[in-house]
């Protein structure tokens, strides 16, 4: 789609933030292989999807700061929303990054502490946190239960995946200008509609078996060719994640 005017991007980002409570979604993706994402979490409001998330410890889920609620019903161990066989655990404590901005989406990362530990199994595993930041061009997979159509919404019952590649900050700034912060990460496929959308926020971007990103924001309607998805770059927050879990264990 080429380079957007900053004013238009600002409007689109505002629209994206207005729908952030529903998160981001997978556009032009495919049904994930069953059980291939045992770290995937659904944050529910009642029985309805609120955001995605990713298990990083038996007591802790990592998600986007804009997914903040007073309490959460956390579903683990199933690729289907509402699966009666899934683990469901209440969570009443969550810790946003202290530098999070609702206006700019900078530091869009949050830890949710489960009220009781998960039961680890082949269907429930913690994701591996990154030892380093992966370079542009790295192949990754993003997953979630967000809407598969935009602007009209169609929420799938099955976990959806999309294969994308990391994009350099230099290239991504051609689209998003100064809206792209230093701890934000872009991913997508050139000339493709493949992207995240409402309902996917906080979900994992996994590259080489490590967590590199959390779904944060993008343009609206979703799936605009050459408008990459924007993620929180987890490798730049590992110290904060470890210290926060230690402080509130």
From Swiss-Prot:
It comes from the Eukaryota. InterPro entries: Peptidase_S1_PA, Peptidase_S1_PA_chymotrypsin, Peptidase_S1A, Trypsin_dom, TRYPSIN_HIS, TRYPSIN_SER. It catalyses: Cleavage of proteins with aromatic side chains in the P1 position. The keyword Hydrolase applies. It is found in: Secreted. Keywords: Disulfide bond, Hydrolase, Protease, Secreted, Serine protease, Signal, Zymogen. Residues 1-21 form the signal peptide. Pfam families: Trypsin. GO terms for molecular function: serine-type endopeptidase activity. The active site is at residues 66, 108, 201. May catalyze the degradation of intercellular cohesive structures in the cornified layer of the skin in the continuous shedding of cells from the skin surface. Specific for amino acid residues with aromatic side chains in the P1 position. Cleaves insulin A chain at '14-Tyr-|-Gln-15' and insulin B chain at '6-Leu-|-Cys-7', '16-Tyr-|-Leu-17', '25-Phe-|-Tyr-26' and '26-Tyr-|-Thr-27'. Could play a role in the activation of precursors to inflammatory cytokines. This is Kallikrein-7. The gene is Klk7.
């Amino acid at each position: 789609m080429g380079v957007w005017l900053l004013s238009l991007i600002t409007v689109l980002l505002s629209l994206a933030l207005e729908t952030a409570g529903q998160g981001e979604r997978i556009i032009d993706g495919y049904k994930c292989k069953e059980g291939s994402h045992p770290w995937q979490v659904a944050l529910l409001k009642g029985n309805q999807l609120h955001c995605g998330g990713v298990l990083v410890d038996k007591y802790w889920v990592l998600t986007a700061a804009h997914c903040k609620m007073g309490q959460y019903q956390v579903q683990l161990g199933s690729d289907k929303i509402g699966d009666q066989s899934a683990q469901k655990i209440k969570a009443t404590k969550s810790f946003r990054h202290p530098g999070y901005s609702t206006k700019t989406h900078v530091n869009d990362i949050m830890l949710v502490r489960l009220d009781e530990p998960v039961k680890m199994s082949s269907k429930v595993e913690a994701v591996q946190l990154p030892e380093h930041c992966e370079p542009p061009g790295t192949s990754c997979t993003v997953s979630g239960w967000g809407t598969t159509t935009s602007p009209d919404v169609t929420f799938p019952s099955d976990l959806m995946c999309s294969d994308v590649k990391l994009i350099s900050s230099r290239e991504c700034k051609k689209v998003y200008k100064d809206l792209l912060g230093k701890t934000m990460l872009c991913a997508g496929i050139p000339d493709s509609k493949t992207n995240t959308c409402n309902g996917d926020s906080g979900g994992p971007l996994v590259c080489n078996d490590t967590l590199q990103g959390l779904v944060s924001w993008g343009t609206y309607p979703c799936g605009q060719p050459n408008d990459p998805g924007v993620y929180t770059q987890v490798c730049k927050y590992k110290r904060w994640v470890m210290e926060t879990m230690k402080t509130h264990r």
